[in-house]
Amino acid sequence: MGNLISTFLSSSKGNSTAQITDCSIWCPRPGQHISIRTFRELNRAPMSNPTSRKTGTVSNGDCSRLTEEVLEADSRHQTTQLPRH
């Protein structure tokens, strides 16, 4: 059986009451293909793509690396300021 993967994300923007919370726990089997898709739309800029997708094949020891990549990409996305028009 593969490693247990647990992720939790909670964020809010400024003085807004909007809050995004995501929590998921799963345990993929070695060799199992997983796809993680996230969608976020808060004051979307024109021509931006709010959907991101991460895919990978799970093997022992690689689960946490894949999860870290997803969380790191999400963290970078949250801290990026969108240009104002």
Swiss-Prot record:
InterPro entries, alphabetized: Gemini_C4
Keywords noted in UniProt: Host cell membrane, Host membrane, Host-virus interaction, Inhibition of host innate immune response by virus, Lipoprotein, Membrane, Myristate, Suppressor of RNA silencing, Viral immunoevasion
Pfam families in alphabetical order: Gemini_C4
UniProt key word Cell membrane: no
Magnesium is among the record's keywords: no
Cellular localization per UniProt: Host cell membrane
Superkingdom of the organism of origin: Viruses
Lipidation feature positions (N-myristoyl glycine): 2
An annotated GO cellular component: membrane
Segments of this protein annotated with the region Disordered: 44-63
Listed Polar residues bias regions: 46-62
Membrane topology of the entry: Lipid-anchor
Similarity comment text for this entry: Belongs to the geminiviridae protein AC4/C4 family.
Protein name: Protein AC4
